[in-house]
Amino acid sequence: STLHNTLFPYTTLFRSHFEVAKKCIEKAKHCLIEKPITATHEEAVSLIEMAEKNEVIVQVGHVERFNPALAVLKNYKVGPLFVEAHRLSQFSPRATDVSVIHDLMIHDIDIILWFVKSPVKKIDANGVDVLTETTDIANARITFENGAVANVTASRLSASPMRKMRIFQPDAYISIDFGKQFVEVYRILEPGEDPLDNSVPATMLGSIEKGNKNKEIYYEKPPVPELNAILEEQRAFIKAIMEGGPVPVGADEAAEALRIVEIIDKQINS
């Protein structure tokens, strides 16, 4: 089939992503590459140039983008001014050759960049290696050109797992639990303003005065569909190949997430 002739499934360590993907792209094979896209940002840029030259599709496996908890937010206006993210896991010998920044934190960095849509202005990072020879616990404060700030924490030495993100903006507070797959939204609306713009039942919690205006506080817990994120990711990749459309997580976005990861890693280990 056309699809069979244009893509090639493979599994390899992230440090060899570039070499394997390079060979596939040179043979005009579309690639779905696990995150991080490559071992270095320099390799990612080179891969993007090759993909454009050979007119092939490259999608990167930032699978959290397909988490159904994140999908429900398409019905909301998300414009963060402050983001707090925690991604914690219990220790496992798996992937100890790569830092927690590359393995876990990169998920939240990708999502935050996708939400904020502004260039990064400043990064302050700290971390420590406890059980391995790479960073096991890391924290980064990322300041964006538009004034937004993100505080991101990742650990692979936690007693219990956690994958949560909290988003604060002038008119709303949004809490996302990627692990348990639920979303809670608190919104401030003017009296008479319809809170049901996404057909989600809203509960009025009370009213406050803000900016010399009376505002109403609403709570919403939108239903999260039962979806398999990995399957949705693969479907999106196949759809892009068959229909020629863009992929949800392109190589450019993945390369930028990796660039930020490299800055954080360099700060911690310099």
Regions found by a protein language model. Name each.
Residues 9, 222-224, 232-270:
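C-terminal helix-rich "cap/oligomerization" subdomain common to oxidoreductases
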Residues 38-95:
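A contiguous active-site-proximal alpha/beta segment in oxidoreductase catalytic domains
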Residues 109-188, 192, 224-227, 231-244:
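Contiguous beta-strand/loop segments that form the cofactor/metal-binding neighborhood of enzyme cores
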Residues 27-29, 54-57, 148:
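A short helix->loop->beta-strand "cap" motif at the edges of active sites that frequently abuts
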Residues 61-68, 91-122, 135-136, 253-254:
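Mid-domain beta-loop-alpha active-site segment that forms a flexible
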